[in-house]
Amino acid sequence: MVIESLILTLEIALIATFINIPISFLCAVIATRSNNETAKFLIDIIVSLPLVLPPVVLGYFLLITFSPSGLIGGILDALGFEIVFTKFAAVLACALVSFPLMSRAFIISIQSVNKDLEKIARSLGSSNINTFFTITIRESKFGISGGILLGFARALGEFGATIIFAGNIEGVSRTIPLAIFQSIQTGDDQNLTLLILCSVILGILSVFINNILIQRSKKNKWV
């Protein structure tokens, strides 16, 4: 049970993280480089809402959206696709809950890049796109890496949205947090101890690596 839950947790968190990377990057680019204030405002709402709403509410929104009676779920059901109470449902729940942390880390990291470096590059003939990838991304790479890790760590600990949208199904959606919940309910103290230990170790590793990336990001700044 412990090994199965650990592997499932890592698998779901990794997939959710990879889904979030391009979306978070796009949001960060719009938030930091767009001249359209309306677009920036909408991005701020999109990034902030999942952060302030309870995970169970997010799970409920996913449930009514992707259930066969929902708009998107109805279309998918007609095409023969089932989302609710599947592994992909757990992935979507983890992705939605961890998305704001990754996005905000990307935004802060890109905003912290020295604008003078970008101006110098453009004055030397570099295009905006080339400047963005050779200067902006290069200077913010450790912050972006930290954001990815932060999103991954949040996905590892996701519980509320997952249990509402994906259920607590062994081998399908029973990640470590849900397995801990199950062990508490059944009084399985042996597995409970091992699961909590795994969760703590993963959390410590994530924080440790994230702190290293933050320190490297500070040292990497050009003066």
Predicted ranges, named:
Residues A39, I107-S123, D189, T193-V223:
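C-terminal transmembrane helix and the adjacent membrane-cytosol boundary/short C-terminal tail
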Residues F18, S103-F106, I110, N114, ...:
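Transmembrane alpha-helices
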Residues M1-E4, I163-L205, I209:
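Interhelical loop and adjacent transmembrane-helix boundary motif
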Residues G59-A95, A166-I169:
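Membrane-interfacial helix termini and adjacent extracytoplasmic/periplasmic loops
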Residues I83-R122, I135, G147, F208, ...:
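Membrane-cytosol interface at the C-terminal ends of specific transmembrane alpha-helices
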